[in-house]
Amino acid sequence: VEYEKRNDKTFVDGERHRVWGADVSIINRFGAGRRRIVLTQEHLAIITPNQISLAQKQKLLGDWYANEVRIVGAELIDQWAPVLQVTPGRLFVQKMKSKWGSCNTQTANIRINSELAKFPKAALEHVVVHELVHLLEPSHSNRFYSLMDQFLPYWRESKALLSAI
């Protein structure tokens, strides 16, 4: 599966964007209220009360991706923390250039890349579990990978998908 590295999208109707590993087409609509994005099975609707610039559409979509990752990431943390018997700190979501996630083992805070909303949810699950496992084993030691194998046996497939970028 090919994922775009560059942001050369123009946000015209019919243009394809990735959401949770699926290609969906953009539709631009005018509507009352605040600017928003609505995801259907086939479309990513950008709804605005008036015409907005390309930069504004990029920011709107970037914020929407971050919110999606925040929601699903929090659900995954709530699901996995008891399984791993860890107590994570706060979840931070932001666009990152060189990492998919990080864990501060002192504060137990987890930081996740908002771009993960473009990949299948299994990739986000892999990153969440990876960062939570760091609360048990801070380094990428043999023990760390043994814990990953124990809790998420298919983690290598997700890692390969993310490493291909």
PLM features: residue spans?
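Active-site-proximal or metal-binding-adjacent scaffold patches in catalytic folds
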Residues: 1-126, 135-165
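Walker B catalytic acidic pair
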Residues: 131
